[in-house]
């Protein structure tokens, strides 16, 4: 399924299956990809985020296929409906050249970096307070220990490619609409694309994607 109801059912099953780990202190993180690659299915990200946050879980979303142009998740007004972290691959549409192997993680300041040996007061999506220690932030817990930073040349390639990314993404979306609708008129071709009104995912596409455009 694509909506929050299907998610709630799946989450309940997972929580039950791994109840021993959850009870011993392990955390549940929700990882979503929307639009999904390669079919372009759109998930009800705001609805899923709200349900997950109500249960105290954190949400990570990869909208690489849609890009921030078609699916600007961080502009969602209600923080309960907004993911905690957003991931993007620079390698694909953002840079557009395919010459840069890189990605980005976007989150709130206190989740990304806290000065060493210190802590900060922050809030959960529901407004309740929490304390974030320095070793819980992304910089110290992941980047510093396990990953590297993008070098200057690759960063330049990404920034240079992003000058045209909105134009490229828009043209690709228009091409998808035209191609899907033309092919769907052929009696011997079965087209599965959310942009078609008869597709079961069409309503979510219209609701959550910019101008109802497909990725």
Predicted regions and their residues:
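Conserved PLP-enzyme active-site core in the AAT-like
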Residues: 1-186, 192
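Conserved PLP-binding catalytic core of the aspartate aminotransferase-like
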Residues: 191-215
């Amino acid at each position: 399924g694509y909506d929050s109801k299907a998610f709630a059912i799946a989450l309940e099953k997972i929580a039950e299956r791994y109840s021993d780990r959850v009870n011993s202190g392990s955390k549940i993180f929700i990882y979503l990809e929307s639009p999904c690659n390669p079919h372009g299915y759109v998930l009800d990200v705001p609805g899923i985020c709200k349900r997950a946050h109500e249960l105290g879980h954190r949400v990570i979303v990869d909208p690489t296929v849609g890009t921030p142009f078609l699916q600007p998740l961080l502009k969602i007004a209600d923080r309960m409906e907004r993911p905690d972290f957003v991931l993007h691959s620079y390698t694909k549409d953002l840079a557009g050249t395919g010459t840069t192997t890189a990605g980005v993680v976007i989150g709130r300041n206190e989740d990304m970096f806290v000065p060493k040996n210190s802590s900060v007061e922050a809030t959960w999506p529901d407004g309740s307070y929490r304390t974030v220690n320095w070793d819980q932030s992304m910089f110290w817990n992941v980047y510093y220990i396990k990953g590297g930073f993008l070098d200057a040349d690759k960063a330049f390639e990404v920034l240079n490619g992003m000058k045209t990314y909105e134009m490229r993404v828009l043209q690709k979306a228009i091409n998808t609409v035209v191609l899907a609708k033309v092919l769907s008129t052929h009696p011997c071709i079965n087209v599965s694309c959310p942009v078609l009104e008869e597709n079961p995912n069409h309503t979510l596409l219209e609701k959550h994607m910019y101008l109802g455009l497909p990725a």
